[in-house]
Design a protein with these regions (language model features):
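PLP-dependent amino-acid enzyme catalytic core
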Residues: 1-175
Length: 175
């Protein structure tokens, strides 16, 4: 719970920024591994925007959250999958975080490593943001069309800048 509360401050900051601009978001996309960032951010945003659609984003091969939401219970990933999104590759959603997210999140989507690299390149080219792979999955979900953002006010959480030099170089070569 302290981790969820701490990560919820991101949601508080987003809510404050939206309210200052008289903006009501339609949906929020956030990366998820164990589920703490998604849970904390979702609690805070849902407090202010009760109609907000909340979507979790994960790397392909590590879509345990999306499958757990569909199954109505925690499920695990098969062993052997690989991803550049090392910060969020978890075997199973956390017990406490899954309970929170199950109540607040509508669904999850999975993105490929190539889509993540494209999102990292986009974040750099458009905003000069150095995003680590796991922190770029929500942006990848939007850019790839796996989450429809057309005519929808969408909050996209991009977090973390701990990226290996060679992976960031791979992303920048896509520009």
């Amino acid at each position: 719970p302290p981790v969820i509360a701490g990560q919820g401050t991101i949601g508080v900051e987003i809510a404050e920024a939206c309210m200052e601009r008289d903006l009501t978001p339609d949906q929020m996309i956030c990366c998820t591994g164990g589920g703490g960032l998604l849970a904390g951010t979702s609690i805070a945003l849902r407090h202010h925007f009760n109609a907000l659609e909340i979507i979790g984003a994960e790397p392909e091969g590590f879509d345990d959250f999306a499958r757990s939401i569909e199954a109505g219970e925690r499920v695990s990933n098969a062993s052997g999958a690989r991803s550049i999104c090392d910060a969020i590759v978890t075997p199973t959603p956390g017990k406490i975080t899954f309970a929170v997210n199950q109540a607040l999140v509508s669904h999850g989507v999975a993105v490929s490593d190539d889509e993540v690299l494209d999102a990292m390149a986009f974040a750099w080219a458009q905003f000069k943001i150095v995003a680590e792979p796991g922190g770029a999955v929500a942006l990848a979900a939007a850019l790839s069309g796996k989450v429809d953002i057309t005519d929808r006010k969408t909050v996209i959480v991009v977090s973390g800048g701990n990226v290996d030099h060679s992976i960031f170089e791979q992303a920048l070569k896509r520009l």
